[in-house]
């Protein structure tokens, strides 16, 4: 009997040879993975809009300047009009999925209202869109060496500057990406 290995609460780190415009040099935080597929949020691709600009589109007003200047990330190529909030601590929100011991992902508006009122989680990453894989698709891409996987670390998500997250996530797996070849092979 074959036992499946799921990657919930893991980072997917794009290998240097991955040249897909949606995923080159990305770190994707896997929020859900089961027999039906996988879903994650890219954590190192900021968009050219701030939280304040995004909130104006959904009619949330009175955003304090320090909150409004937060970057919004491109979470992935699927449903880019849909918002996702990765946060620590998990807290109690209408639609929160616990990803690990420290991190939740929420899609309900109540968390945005709380953030703008200074009552939200102290650490957040706000994204539009998500990355998704169908049944066995992610496993196939891993077998093809498109990705490096390692258990996620919330410090990389919330405390590491986004420009350094690709290298920092790989370092968790003991990999220096600058030393990898762009050639793909199997031993």
UniProtKB/Swiss-Prot annotation:
Q: Which residues form a coiled coil?
A: none
Enumerate the Gene3D superfamilies for this protein.
VC0467-like
Task: Tell me a GO cellular component.
Answer: cytosol
Q: Which InterPro entries match?
A: AlgH-like
The source's domain of life comes to Bacteria
Belongs to which family? Belongs to the UPF0301 (AlgH) family.
Q: Which HAMAP family match?
A: UPF0301 (MF_00758)
What is this protein identified as? UPF0301 protein Noc_0368
Origin organism is Nitrosococcus oceani (strain ATCC 19707 / BCRC 17464 / JCM 30415 / NCIMB 11848 / C-107)
